[in-house]
Amino acid sequence: MKKHDLINEFIKNHQEVVQYIDGLNESEFGYAQIGKWTAGQQLEHILLTIKPFPKILNAKTFIREKFGNINRPTWSYRTVLENYTKTSLKAPAQFVPQRELSIDRKAGIIAEIDSTLKAISEVFENYTEDELDTLTLPHPLLGQLTIREMFYLMSYHPLHHQKQIMIGL
């Protein structure tokens, strides 16, 4: 997937899930099956997972020096997802939402997601196709991923959570 298509898919998938959650009523927003997150918690989790990207992507030199280049061929979208589904799928502590999330916070979280997506899109434009395939970032479950692979995964990620919400309601 080319850079332009990749960022568009990333943005579109996040906006689709945000729109879905925004359409939920208070009962649906706060409902969770035992041991699962509410739709509100899913929304906050999505924000927590994208929030670091504008800052880190803006630091290309830091990425190169700290994490280096990948020493294997870039994984396809399918390979990224296959490898992801083999992990625990358990969110690390820094990405776990608050226990209780009031519907009053929904609009604020959505606004923050929107502004974060805009910032990510702007910074992403500074990357070449080659940099997307060579520069790496650490993923808590998959280890080093190229930036392209990270965005493959992060494009899928909100859809995974939307599916969880839909199954749970």
Pin down the residues of each PLM region.
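A short small-residue
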Residues: S27, A93-L101, L137-L141
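Amphipathic, well-ordered alpha-helical segments in soluble domains
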Residues: N13-Y20, T49, T116, H157, ...
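Active-site oxyanion/phosphate-handling segment shared across diverse enzymes
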Residues: I113-E131
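Short, helix-capping/interhelical loops that line the mouth of catalytic, cofactor-
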Residues: M1-D5, K55-E112
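Hydrophobic packing residues in well-ordered alpha-helices of helical domains and bundles
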Residues: F10, A39, I109-I113, F151-M154
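Short, contiguous alpha-helical
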Residues: E28-Y84, E125-L169
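Extreme N-terminal tail/first-helix region
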Residues: M1-Q15
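N-terminal leader/capping segments at the start of a protein or of a new domain
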Residues: I21-N25
